[in-house]
């Protein structure tokens, strides 16, 4: 094959005609110093707060400090290959993450990159992670229930859609277990769940993912993971990334639930970054704006007005206390931001009362409006009864003679404590809870031995599912107990008791 000279000249002419000169302009700077995942950069005069800068090797950095002659940047990756004098490029992009249905069922990092080996996240839309919380007019008061599937929570500290309920307690008291149960309880409820793991061990996150997958909950759940080995900047930003992804559903008229596990570790990573950026330390060496760190995050959980689609975002932040010290800086901050707290106690946990909820210290400030009437009817006095039982139990230790009424209160209290115990990963729907609590509070279990209460409850639930499913359905539909239904319930429980052997 021979190429003729005129053909060559033709090709050259075509190339000249289609030639486009491209000049890319980007503002660059120079690394002044780098270390501990913090870089000082000179020369990027127009950089914005929360903007991403590109370092050599594709490592991204987040602009946090804007000073007169340089900017303080938190690196979102390894700093080992970055050195003084390296060029830094502005991207002009504010920190944003992919949102939408594409992230559902995935395990991703705070930047939106998949870490579950299931291929790339094909999201059609991205959103900035720092978004202003909805105002007062945009909101509606909390009025729909968000069931956790736990009798102790749904009966005494009910949670509503759009609420922020703090889960607080020492390490190893079952805080994560309560939240995982809450995710499992959303099956078939049309709620999109988000679990943000901040500073956890990788093995713990893998275990959570496996548990959710095993119970079929990953279909509607997203896990955002910034483990203990990640840079502090990613641990700090992970909560906002998760919140932005959950807000997408809230803004589209759906219901979402987000769990921050846990905000103590987020505050620690923020303190680390602030001190390295030379911001002045305050109480417990936390920076002055650590309250704002959590308030701007948790204020984004809301029940939106009908005009905005009536979507909701419910937040369950977790705080780990040290030796039960609820009056430390971060716990008091988050308690004052949230709409109530569920307090878990190691003593109760070790005594076999699980979930280890201290009923006296746990409150729900707005959830009462969201509780269904049937639950109010059966559990209305439960909190007070348990408080009286605990007081009487303390006196009864002295072995003084007790009158009949006191003995009845003590024996019923013991049975109610036993009844409120629940195995892990076994959430109950509202009708099942109403039946169990009805049997307990109306005295049907007073003659059942304490050690047989759990067996009685299991048998009762099985009996209702097999023989009296019409009553279960009626409770689900009516969401209230009328006289006819109360009579039916009583008769059915009596019938079951005749055949029950402890």
From Swiss-Prot:
Keywords: ATP synthesis, ATP-binding, Cell inner membrane, Cell membrane, CF(1), Hydrogen ion transport, Ion transport, Membrane, Nucleotide-binding, Translocase, Transport. It is a peripheral membrane protein. It catalyses: ATP + H2O + 4 H(+)(in) = ADP + phosphate + 5 H(+)(out). Its EC number is 7.1.2.2. It is found in: Cell inner membrane. GO terms for molecular function: ADP binding; ATP binding; proton-transporting ATP synthase activity, rotational mechanism. The record marks 362 as: Required for activity. Pfam families: ATP-synt_ab (PF00006), ATP-synt_ab_C (PF00306), ATP-synt_ab_N (PF02874). InterPro entries: ATP_synth_asu-like_sf (IPR023366), ATP_synth_asu_C (IPR000793), ATP_synth_asu_C_sf (IPR038376), ATP_synth_F1_a_nt-bd_dom (IPR033732), ATP_synth_F1_asu (IPR005294), ATPase_a/bsu_AS (IPR020003), ATPase_F1/V1/A1_a/bsu_N (IPR004100), ATPase_F1/V1/A1_a/bsu_N_sf (IPR036121). It is an enzyme of class 7 (translocase). Its main location: membrane. GO terms for cellular component: plasma membrane; proton-transporting ATP synthase complex. The keyword ATP-binding applies. ATP binds at residues 169-176. Produces ATP from ADP in the presence of a proton gradient across the membrane. The alpha chain is a regulatory subunit. F-type ATPases have 2 components, CF(1) - the catalytic core - and CF(0) - the membrane proton channel. CF(1) has five subunits: alpha(3), beta(3), gamma(1), delta(1), epsilon(1). CF(0) has three main subunits: a(1), b(2) and c(9-12). The alpha and beta chains form an alternating ring which encloses part of the gamma chain. CF(1) is attached to CF(0) by a central stalk formed by the gamma and epsilon chains, while a peripheral stalk is formed by the delta and b chains. Belongs to the ATPase alpha/beta chains family. This is ATP synthase subunit alpha. The lineage of its organism: Bacteria, Pseudomonadati, Thermodesulfobacteriota, Desulfovibrionia, Desulfovibrionales. The gene is atpA.
């Amino acid at each position: 094959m021979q190429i003729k000279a005129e053909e060559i000249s033709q090709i050259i002419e075509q190339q000249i005609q289609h030639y486009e000169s491209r000049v890319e302009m980007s503002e660059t700077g120079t690394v002044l110093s780098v270390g501990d995942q913090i870089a000082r950069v000179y020369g990027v005069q127009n950089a914005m707060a929360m903007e991403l800068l590109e370092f050599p090797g594709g490592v991204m950095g987040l602009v946090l400090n804007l000073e007169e002659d340089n900017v303080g940047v938190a690196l979102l990756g390894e700093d080992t290959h970055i050195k003084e004098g390296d060029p830094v490029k502005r991207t002009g992009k504010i920190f944003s993450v992919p949102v939408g249905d594409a992230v559902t069922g995935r395990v991703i990092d705070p930047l939106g990159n998949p870490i579950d080996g299931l291929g790339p996240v094909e999201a059609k839309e991205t959103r900035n992670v720092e978004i202003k919380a909805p105002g007062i007019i945009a909101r509606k008061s909390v009025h729909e229930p968000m069931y956790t599937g736990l009798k102790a929570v749904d009966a005494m500290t009910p949670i509503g859609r759009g609420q922020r309920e703090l889960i607080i307690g020492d390490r190893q008291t079952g805080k994560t277990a309560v939240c995982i149960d809450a995710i499992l309880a959303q099956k078939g409820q049309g709620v999109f769940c988000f679990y943000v793991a901040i500073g956890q061990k990788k093995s713990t996150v893998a275990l959570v993912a496996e548990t959710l997958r095993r119970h079929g909950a990953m279909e509607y759940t997203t896990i955002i993971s910034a483990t203990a080995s990640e840079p502090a900047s990613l641990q700090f930003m992970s909560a906002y990334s998760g919140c932005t992804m959950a807000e997408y559903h809230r803004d589209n008229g759906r219901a979402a639930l987000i769990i921050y596990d846990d905000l103590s570790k987020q505050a620690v990573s923020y303190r680390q970054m602030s001190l390295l950026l030379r911001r002045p330390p305050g109480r417990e060496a936390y920076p002055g704006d650590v309250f704002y760190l959590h308030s701007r995050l948790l204020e984004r959980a809301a029940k939106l007005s009908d005009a905005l689609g009536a979507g909701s975002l419910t937040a369950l932040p977790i705080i780990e206390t040290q030796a039960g010290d609820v009056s430390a800086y971060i716990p008091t901050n988050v308690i004052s931001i949230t709409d109530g707290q569920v307090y878990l106690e190691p003593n109760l946990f070790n005594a076999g009362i699980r979930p280890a909820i201290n009923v006296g210290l746990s409150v729900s400030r707005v959830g009462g409006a969201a509780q269904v009437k049937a639950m109010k009817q059966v559990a209305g006095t439960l909190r007070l009864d348990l408080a009286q039982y605990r007081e009487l139990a303390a006196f009864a230790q002295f072995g003084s003679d007790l009158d009949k009424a006191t003995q009845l209160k003590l024996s019923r209290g013991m049975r109610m404590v036993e009844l409120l115990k629940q195995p892990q990963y076994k959430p109950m729907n509202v009708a099942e809870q109403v039946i169990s609590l009805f049997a307990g509070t109306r005295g049907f279990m007073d003659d059942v031995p304490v050690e047989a209460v759990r067996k009685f409850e299991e048998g009762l639930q099985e009996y209702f599912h097999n023989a009296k499913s019409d009553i279960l359905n009626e409770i689900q539909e009516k969401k209230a107990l009328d006289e006819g239904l109360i009579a039916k319930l009583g008769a059915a429980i009596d019938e079951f008791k005749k055949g029950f052997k402890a």
